[in-house]
Amino acid sequence: MSAPRRSPESTAARAGAEGAAVSGPYVLGVDSGGSGLRVALGAVGGSAPVATRDCEGPVRTGPAGIDAGHLLEQLLPAARLLLEQCGAAGSGIEAVAIGAAGMATLGGQLRAELPAALEDALGVRRLALAGDAVTAYAGAVGQRPGAVVAGGTGMIALGTDLTSWRRADGWGHLLGDSGGGAWIGRAGLDAAMRAHDGRRGGSAALLSRLEAVFGPAPELPGLLYPRTDRPAVLASFAPEVAACAGHDPVAAGILREAAAHVAEAAEAVCPAAGRDGEPCEVALTGGLFRMGDPLLVPLREELSRRLPQARMVPGSGDPLTGALSIARALATGDLRLPRHPTLLRVPGEGPERQSGQVATEQDSRPVSL
């Protein structure tokens, strides 16, 4: 569902050429996800990254949550290399924003250890620790009221009126992520297996694609169930569903149902109106929506029906762009996104700034994430 990652060497070489003429002070944006750690260096007064670097492999997660030591092992050398390539070796970093998948539930060690470690190693004066849904929001919408649906292997919707956050789904492939890549892929494989068995709701077209991708249908359980990356394997079949949707009604129906789930999540988190009574902005971000018209056409229809007051906007940037923009806003004292103890935390701010709330789609009362 995601684009191939560049090697650290090729990314670093490109960064040196791009960033040589830009002066500091500098900020760092960091995106830590399932496919690895990405780092962007930017100037406080700039808009685009000065340089970027991709680190190989994801940050480890253990019994204590996301491993702060392992994150630092990747982040610190990358940051120093980027500074060196910009002719600023030894310079301090004004602000850092780190967005991480699982930050809300698995980020306790990061919140405990990173503030002091980054200050000691890089002279970081200001730090923001955010969930990856928040950096996706910042990258797509910025610091305006609105809503973002981030779709890839999973699916999560996040919205804010700039006083609190609202979240819908993002509960993983066993409890939710309805309409996401793994959900679509699993539904497509279910239809294929139904066709193999002769049960109602089967799709011969999807059975043919299953056999082309995975081999004989009866062998699929033995291939799938031992895998530790089952959501990604399921999601890998989602493009096959999209490819069949133009001529197979079962595949088209799966994508219509996925679109309904995505629109439902967006509806749950979208503020009633933007600033000054403007329509709520809704952005779609992530690899899921690169499947094109088979998903986007029914999704636009569902969003228009459920959110007639909303305005669809193109996402202006990805989570790494969002992390860098949060770091810049933090450095200039202009971070307007609502704080939350686990969703967007700025260590050193008063407790009243960290006490923001998150509401879920089932409950309009504020609840902790």
Where are these predicted regions, by residue range?
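Phosphate-binding/catalytic loop of phosphoryl-transfer enzymes
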Residues: 103-203, 343-345, 351-353, 366
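ATP-binding/phosphotransfer module of carbohydrate and carboxylate kinases, centering on a glycine-rich
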Residues: 2-92, 139-145, 189-369
